[in-house]
């Protein structure tokens, strides 16, 4: 059996070909096989041909010859040659020998032959072919041999079925006769179509099987009747006949031709208007118009040039003028008509124009490929054809090249007559033209491979950059190597000469890079794929440096540390520190640092020389940040003993100014003191409660001092010497330090010094200023197509400094990058954001900015989508009008927007009025509406508007006013197509017949059955304004009949008729009996069931059961006859038989069963044991797997392996460099199931060399060798 998917290999190297031979000549067929000695059989009509006076068989090596001597008409037909499993068919066609006959006038047309006196049609014997049977029927047995003269002495057939031809719609009968004189029982005949289709299961309207027996001649006649032939019946058929010990079969073919068209008519007779009866006298048709073209004068003139000897010439073979006309261009029609004597040119042209061109019917293909196929990339596709010959070989071509089997890419299948090509894992390379070739015929198709849409898995992000910065857009798609397109504001981007745009692919990621962004690069950038697009906005701003935190004045003492710190908006900006206008050079005491956006100047061990003006100048910007360093000098004066304590502060009137410190900075209060003895210093902070200063939008807003009332509840003692807030006291001063000032450190601090002589006290006010608190979440309003309005409230705390303005940011909902919308501070509490993308969900947030810096961001706003109102709905029309209602319908607007539609609003107003009234409360999601409670007779205008998140769109209004008044409409039933034929329902099934109708006002509906009104509760009628329903909950047989429905409006009505057929299971067959039993066969006979279930009987199912097990097995299904033969029963067993009847509902509930078992007798059998020839299994040794060269490492055990076969078991010997290793203990030899192993224990360099394995038995000797190299590890 050939490997699945591969074409079987033919046994013939040269195949015989069909030939045409003249009658009486010999015909020679030659075939060559692949090898000599192959048994070859020659067949004709399915029977073997043996050497005789008629047939000659010869064989020379691989050449085989069949000679048919003195070929006659009876030898014409189909032949075959068989070698092994290969079978080749060929045909022999016999041509009649040419005879010299005088030229005969063409036969007249049938219409003229019956009407012209003195003319008679030629007899059938002169025409050379038999007349067709009436109504297109023919018989395949007419040309066969008669029953009295059997031509097959070897087989069972007296007469075999012959090949037949029939036209579409005609009938044909195939007959087979079997001699029964020598048969003990009737033969079993089976008819097949193709290889496997048993025609007994196809018996029906188009196919019938008949058999009879002639007792006089003792001949069985079997007939196959085909009626109303269809083109699908064309093909090869087979008749098999079998008896107890004989078997024979016969093959024949059926060809169904298309119905005969006008092209099959005798063109010369149909369009010749004159006859040459009686000495060439011209007879004209009296009804012909004298204006019709007539070539008779030209024909006479042509005949005058002929010589007398022309009449003695042989009559040439008649040509098919119709084929000549079909293939000739229209310009040649007159010449052809003149040449072949066609005088009625106008009638010929009219008939030719009405003819359709018959397509050439394929003889090799029963079913061809479709014109085109489509498959998605990565899927598989199956291309299937169906052949007329089951044994034909096919070739599959791709773009003209034959497809070879390669792995699992292409799979070839052959199942019966079907040939299938399966292409797995289709790629773009498989998009091509494919052809299936059978012999000289082929059918073509095209395969289109569709790529799946490339989807956006990670969209683009909006970006905000400065002029000159690098921009990189990144997007991720679903397919690697996908083709994408970059657009800017709708224009495709390409690689320019300046290489401004760079496109980069990294797997599924695609990058667009702009090395140096310019102001003109701002806009919307999009990446388009076959499955969608990603859109992002690029905003390019001119460079502008913002100062988030400026440097502040410092007052430090000797040996202290001074730190100036500032923060700018750009972390890449460098700067220069100046001291009194001169650049400051860092050293071991002065350090300059730049970390991110923070620039810091640190001076250790401050000296009086460090007191100066310090400035920070950013590079590239006209900006200058300045502050002053104050050095606190301690003066030592001589104080006599017993001096009262005193606090030395340079504060006029002892009312110190407020000390301002930025949150996060270090606060150090160095208070000089004096006194003798040394005073005790006490630091206290007053705990107060007062009003917070409200956030002010502008720095120049007036300050209300009347609302700053404070109440002092208590004082907190500060005495810690370590920690964030600490106090350090020396002999001449007290130092109060706060690391990282916070808002809670703000307040009034009291310094008290005491000694026995007295005390002194000073209050110091410290104010901590900070960035503002984060504002509340902004609110979004007035959302438009690409804009919205953002509103927010001031922060609860302004950080002790007036609010300078606000900064606004936005981002896409699914993104993580916030984009700044403004560089200039917004002074108001609202802003209109523009240049947004419609249909994209955004979020907004806001920052507050004061002199100290920028606050934390506010919480994000509620997500919102910029969207514009939809356009007006389309195709507004009035569907129906009554006395109080109007039905409207429309279609959705052309532009809906990304947010979809919320619904539609419908309004109306009287003609001439401008006030519109809502037709319904709220919105409707449907595109139709019934407006009720309208005044009768009013003329109203209607309009419809579409609504979405952005609000209502433009309205669409009816072109003319609608008059609210009922329109009279004739009643009409619209019977569905499936109700126009007989309605079949099974017993117990519900019946629900819905019939729509039209008519205004509402028609009156009436149902009748067989002319009588419907009665009973089982049948119910339900009517609505537009349809009526006949409903039966459970159908019964009594419900079958003809129903009529009538709709009536006044004197107008319409009727429709329905036929209901309620079917049930049939009753079982009657009188089942065994008519005969012989050999292994039993003949059964029964009568049809009494009740067929009110429908056509499909057939019978015959089953058998062994008496021992009583397990039923099906013998025949869908059997149409009332008698059958059950073959192949087991000898010695008893059988019961039963038969079910079947229709469209199912099988009968019960079966007709035989009452008594039928026993199959056991005949005597003589066992003859078979003789077997002793087989010699001896075989010389041979290595199936030889030794291979190896390189091993010294000290590690190595193995050499090979495999050997032989019978008897060979003796194995191992050699190294010619020395036998059998006595060496360092080598171990193993042999298991033919696998030989030599184990070398811990080899050393001396073990290297050539190793040989020798196998020896009585049949011979074999050896193999290899080289072993032992390497010493380095």
Curated annotation (Swiss-Prot):
Organism annotation: Homo sapiens (Human)
Start and end residues of each stretch annotated as Disordered: 107-153
Reported effect, residue 998 to E: In CMH4; no effect on protein abundance; no effect on endopeptidase activity
Effect of residue 733 to C: In CMH4; uncertain significance
Residues engaged in binding Zn(2+): 208, 210, 223, 225
General function of this protein: Thick filament-associated protein located in the crossbridge region of vertebrate striated muscle a bands. In vitro it binds MHC, F-actin and native thin filaments, and modifies the activity of actin-activated myosin ATPase. It may modulate muscle contraction or may play a more structural role.
GO cellular component, one term: cardiac myofibril
Name by which UniProt lists this protein: Myosin-binding protein C, cardiac-type
Effect listed in the UniProt record for changing residue 1131 to T: In CMH4; uncertain significance
Biased composition (Low complexity): 107-141
PROSITE patterns: FN3, IG_LIKE
Effect ascribed to mutating residue 654 to H: In CMH4; uncertain significance; as well folded and stable as the wild-type
Disulphide bridges: 436-443
Location of Omega-N-methylarginine modifications: 1241
Modified residues (Phosphoserine): 47, 275, 284, 304, 311, 427, 550
GO biological process: cardiac muscle contraction; cell adhesion; heart morphogenesis; regulation of cardiac muscle cell contraction; regulation of muscle filament sliding; regulation of striated muscle contraction; sarcomere organization; ventricular cardiac muscle tissue morphogenesis
Positions carrying Phosphothreonine: 607
Disorder named in the UniProt entry: Cardiomyopathy, familial hypertrophic, 4: A hereditary heart disorder characterized by ventricular hypertrophy, which is usually asymmetric and often involves the interventricular septum. The symptoms include dyspnea, syncope, collapse, palpitations, and chest pain. They can be readily provoked by exercise. The disorder has inter- and intrafamilial variability ranging from benign to malignant forms with high risk of cardiac failure and sudden cardiac death.
Outcome, altering residue 896 to M: May act as a phenotype modifier in cardiomyopathy patients
Keywords carried by this UniProt record: Acetylation, Actin-binding, Cardiomyopathy, Cell adhesion, Disease variant, Disulfide bond, Immunoglobulin domain, Metal-binding, Methylation, Muscle protein, Phosphoprotein, Repeat, Thick filament, Ubl conjugation, Zinc
